[in-house]
Amino acid sequence: MKKFNLFLIFFMTTSRLVLGQMDINAVNKPVELLNSANEDIENGNYTDAVQKLLAAIRLEPKIREMYLSLNTACSHTNQISILKQYLIKAKAIFEEDDEICYYLGNIYQNENNFQKAIAEYSLAIKYAQKNGEDFELVYAYYQNRASCYLKINECSKSIPDFTYALKLNPDNGAIYANRGIAYYKTGKKTEACKDWRKAQSLGNSECRNLRTPVLQISNIPRR
């Protein structure tokens, strides 16, 4: 009986060790795939990265960084339908995640689904106000929502967003250029020319083509 008890204890202990090892492997494998995928991204091997990230998410769907890396990889391989599917999944898992909503908004904007894009950017802005606006991409939440408003000719709505984006990123010539277009379309030609001049000073040479005819037609003094 003692020998049997010793054997049983040994068997149970060994089983626990094996199960413990299996548990560790189950935890480590998706992380290993993620790390390998990130190395692939750094080396420009985006197709391999996508496959590894999809495998990692299947094993463990609750690691946020996997979806962020997938956004980078799929954007380079143009696998947007896959990316969209997984970002929607991520949005359901990670509540009030402004960055994920922003990336989803970008997909809708590229699909010319501007109302859905505006909705996602609005969520991103709302969550960023809770999570903190020190994240480097927050200015783009406002910039991209403003761009959507501009594309659907709701120019008066775009101007406050462009203005706030400039508060967060004051040296962005593209924002000045687009706010200038919004000003022009709302009849504010002087403000438009000021923005285009500023954009030009920041390296956006195309603004000269916008600004010069307006100055000539409107008799606005050059500065």
Task: State where each predicted segment sits.
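Canonical tetratricopeptide repeat
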Residues: 69-72, 103, 137, 144, ...
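Terminal, low-structured helical/coil segments at or just beyond the last alpha-helical repeat
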Residues: 22-28, 190-223
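Helix-start (N-cap) detector for alpha-helical repeat units in TPR-like alpha-solenoids
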Residues: 29-30, 64-65, 98-99, 132, ...
